């Protein structure tokens, strides 16, 4: 009887911790506007930065002129945010573990980009950039409003304008100006 009660107590207490990670992973937190846990935020930001950098390095090789220009800025800016995030974690201002590799979802997108060429590459790269930046803006907005680590919350708020600018730029990839129009 005691073992059953102890087991049930462990399951009940583990629920909220598991729910936060599961909620972020499944998009439930985003849909509800709930701030991610610090560990989830750090993990998602690090993976997003790795994907942005690696996919944009491919775009620098395979993309059109507009994509190459955008990709250069993505590599520069996301290297900067990666360095800043690592600094926060390494300075012990944030208690979290940085991932060292992409998750399976981002890795499969990167693999698809590696094998794509021409218009297929452009279509996939442009689409991935929009969705990645929409997710990043949501993630940073939610953490900046409701995150539980002051240093990371402040950093998220300061980084958000650049991510919104990236999203606007990504939405314009592949949209050439009409005749007589300048961009």
Describe these PLM feature segments.
Residues 2-6, 18-183:
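His/Met- and acidic-residue-enriched segments that coordinate or traffic transition-metal cofactors
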Residues 9, 14-16:
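N-terminal signal peptide c-region/cleavage motif recognized by signal peptidases
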